């Protein structure tokens, strides 16, 4: 049975997210000799070579012995990167972590391969606490799904989706999600300073509170709504703060913000599809 530890895995693109996945695979015991990374940037190749990873600037060379090919390039260079590989990936599992790149778009560019998995990761994967929304074409069987989960699991949570359209919702919730929490942290730190705390104190308290609240929500049998109610005493300080949130319609604005993110994700996917068709 195929497992991530007995596969040759090629990464087309060696940026931060690719390096996060590589780090996760190495931590699970995948030998460096089974990983090849193709990237045009010499500095990126040098960083990976220092870890014992085989690198090249030649995508054709990189995929030669690969069982799995992970596409990790910027959306704007997708067509340029994939067109020379057309017809050469039909015997390989292709995993894309490229934002906005629909399975049909990738399939049209590479030709032949229908074993395509689309992943929407997020940046906490860099510290092994990511959240990955995953969708696969019908040609991707159980073994390929398990293999994909193994490759991604070392960097965080993996959730398989029922249809590809849900990727846009995943993008809005978890793909862009870290920025929402950073925004809240910024605001709380700024408020703490305005209330008389030193910046380093306000920062430490805010970050630890965010970590603790997330850990409570993950480990508790109660929902986040129930946890919020449990710490909100009648006429207390928490209620005073939450009433300000309610008057400002924070909940409604968050829903509107995520809807805007989903819409933009849909637009970007369409723009990328149109661009690749015109190449």
Task: Give the residues covered by each predicted segment.
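NAD(P)+-binding Rossmann beta1-loop-alpha1 motif at the extreme N-terminus of oxidoreductases
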Residues: 1-57, 61, 193-194
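Small-residue helix-packing motif on alpha-helices
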Residues: 35, 62, 198-205, 227, ...
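Internal alpha-helical scaffold of NAD(P)-dependent oxidoreductase catalytic cores
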Residues: 105-115, 131-169, 182-219
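Short pre-catalytic strand/loop immediately N-terminal to key active-site residues, enriched for Gly-Thr
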Residues: 117, 166-172, 224-229
